[in-house]
């Protein structure tokens, strides 16, 4: 996105996903369903959701796809719309029914009730998803931010917004639904993420983690030196005694196709 400066991206915690990473993430997901629902919160130009849908269509006989994306950056929305118009035309030519919604509202403020354990407040099944794929924004939120106030059950200290995206997404999965995120590694340790970890690991069984050995390569175009990981998991509906997590690693994105386990 040459129209957005690196300074503006950093201020918004906005780092656009390289195509190589989008394809790698989409390759970790699969389904046998004919009717699929996908959520891409913080979608940017829809690189992730487009890569995922392309992958799913190649894998199986898909009859219909429902896609919901969230993006609040008015400078990006035009590109988001262009990408989805092109995707819709491509799927139409393949005989696939495709419905999509672009939400310009704040993802957290619109969906924080998904964190609730009260059945009366939980999202309807129709509002849940088979797949959630995301490269959310990364930045710390002040304690008086409205998004912090509505997510107090997973906040301890000053949270990073990406953890709120992950937690809320966990509550928006269908039964047997899967999510995959590329996020900083910071959630894995430290007091500030304690309540988030308790909630997220209680709701999601992590099945795959990809580690990058270098900080420089992942979002090189945005001049980012952030330690990031790719995390995949599925909704936990019952206790599984024999849980196995596949861990792979690469130096960066140039050797993703040769990622080692």
Outline where the language-model segments fall.
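N-terminal, positively charged/glycine-rich alpha-helical extensions of SAM-dependent methyltransferases
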Residues: 1-7
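Signature of N6-adenine DNA methyltransferases within the class I
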Residues: 10-24, 42-50, 64, 70, ...
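Glycine-rich helix-loop-beta junction characteristic of Rossmann-like nucleotide cofactor-binding loops
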Residues: 27-33
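Secondary-structure boundary motif
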Residues: 31, 58, 86-93, 175, ...
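Conserved beta-strand elements of the Class I
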Residues: 37-39
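Class I S-adenosyl-L-methionine
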Residues: 53, 78-81, 85-92, 197, ...
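Conserved S-adenosyl-L-methionine
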Residues: 55-66
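S-adenosyl-L-methionine
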Residues: 84-120
């Amino acid at each position: 996105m040459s129209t957005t400066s690196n300074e503006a991206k950093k201020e918004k915690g906005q780092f656009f996903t390289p195509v190589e990473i989008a394809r790698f993430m989409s390759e970790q997901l699969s389904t046998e369903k004919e009717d699929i629902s996908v959520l891409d919160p913080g979608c940017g130009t829809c690189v992730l959701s487009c890569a995922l849908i392309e992958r799913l269509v190649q894998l199986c006989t898909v009859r219909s796809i429902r896609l919901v994306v969230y993006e609040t950056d008015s400078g990006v929305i035009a590109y988001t719309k262009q990408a989805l118009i092109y995707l819709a035309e491509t799927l139409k030519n393949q005989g696939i029914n495709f419905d999509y919604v672009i939400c310009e509202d704040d993802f957290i403020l619109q969906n924080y009730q998904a964190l609730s354990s009260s059945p009366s407040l939980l999202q309807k099944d129709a509002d849940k998803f088979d797949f959630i794929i995301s490269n959310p924004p990364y930045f710390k939120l002040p304690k008086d931010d409205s998004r912090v106030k509505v997510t107090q059950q997973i906040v301890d200290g000053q949270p990073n917004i990406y953890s709120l995206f992950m937690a809320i997404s966990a509550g928006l999965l269908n039964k047997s639904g899967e999510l995959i995120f590329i996020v900083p590694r910071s959630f894995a340790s430290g007091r500030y993420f304690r309540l988030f970890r308790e909630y997220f690991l209680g709701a999601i069984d992590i099945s795959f983690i990809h580690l990058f050995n270098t900080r420089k390569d992942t979002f090189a175009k945005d001049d980012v030196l952030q330690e990031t990981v790719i995390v995949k998991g599925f909704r936990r509906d019952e206790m599984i005694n024999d849980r196995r997590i596949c861990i792979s690693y690469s130096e960066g994105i140039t050797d993703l196709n040769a990622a080692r386990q």
